[in-house]
């Protein structure tokens, strides 16, 4: 019995070693899903984030209404994925996809305030460039997060943010800019396996190029 216990313990150690995140991984969690809630002009927008391979594969699923401004579908659910460096908005019900342009690192889908910073590999250079300061620990969605303040430059101007990070994953944020104050909060977080199809674009789907929506009186832009 003792030998069996030692063997089992050894196997557990080996399994843990094999499960370590790669050096360049965005997250320190292998796979999972978390649900973010964001207030969009008085309406709650729910976005589900799926990830695998320690954050190297990601997908978001949102209700269509909040995606209208950036060329998404106006109804139903929209799945956003990246395939070979290109972002696609996928409507699985209609079996269609929209190939999105490069917004220069800006997430056009109001992605819960997710930033482009690799919080799992936070360097002194990144901290200095974004004026990042650690504020302590707080619990969000049942897990302990590290709280940071920061200032970022984006296409919307200078933006002050407070973010809550769990193993590289941003589970809460509050943003202040010239356009106002907004943010998002994780309502549920689960570490679990995610089906590979969540990150794939079926070959049978019809793919269309992104079309900038008609902005009416803003034709001068």
Which role fits each region the language model picked out?
Residues 15-19:
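Sec/Tat signal peptide C-region and signal peptidase I cleavage site
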Residues 21-221:
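Extended soluble regions of mature proteins
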Residues 4-14:
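Sec-dependent N-terminal signal peptides
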